[in-house]
Amino acid sequence: MKIIIDPYRGGDDYGAKIGDKYEKDILLDLSNYMNNSFNNQNINSILTRNTDESLTDEDRVNQINKLKQDNDLI
């Protein structure tokens, strides 16, 4: 089994601003933390993005469909 983590937002899609941080940065930081935590426990996980890039909804769905198997969690 693999866990697919989708931080959403990114690139030109900043999301809400909370204090001095944008939602896209908070989501990426949280997703990286989750991914590292899972991997440190030998739980297979992968991110749909690990840099500040923008994905369309179609690109995101295509990438998830390419990565996932029948028993994966998204």
Task: Locate the predicted segments by residue.
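Catalytic-core regions of hydrolytic enzymes
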Residues: 2-74
